[in-house]
Curated annotation (Swiss-Prot):
General function of this protein: Binds directly to 16S ribosomal RNA.
Transmembrane segments: none
HAMAP family: Ribosomal_bS20
Gene Ontology process terms (BP): translation
Annotated source species: Methylococcus capsulatus (strain ATCC 33009 / NCIMB 11132 / Bath)
One Gene Ontology MF term: structural constituent of ribosome
Name recorded for this polypeptide: Small ribosomal subunit protein bS20
Amino acid sequence: MANIASAKKRARQAENNRAHNAALRSRLRTYIKKVILAVDSGDLTKAQEAFRQAVPIIDSSVNKGLIHRNKAARSKSRLNARVKALALQAAS
């Protein structure tokens, strides 16, 4: 354990930041799972709405430094591909 006051403060801040980032990461994963579950259920409107809600969450995760911008782009692309595949399946 740190003895210097500034090191103690940094340890406290690191713990607070870790907990905060964990909550944000959990929220991100939850929104991604909502899209996947909606697509798997076969409900197109629900899947599209879940995707619309997930995109800003993914983008804000990049701005907060939780994930890399390429990972965000990849996630959005894959989710969008699932939704579009469901739309094509529903149309035919």
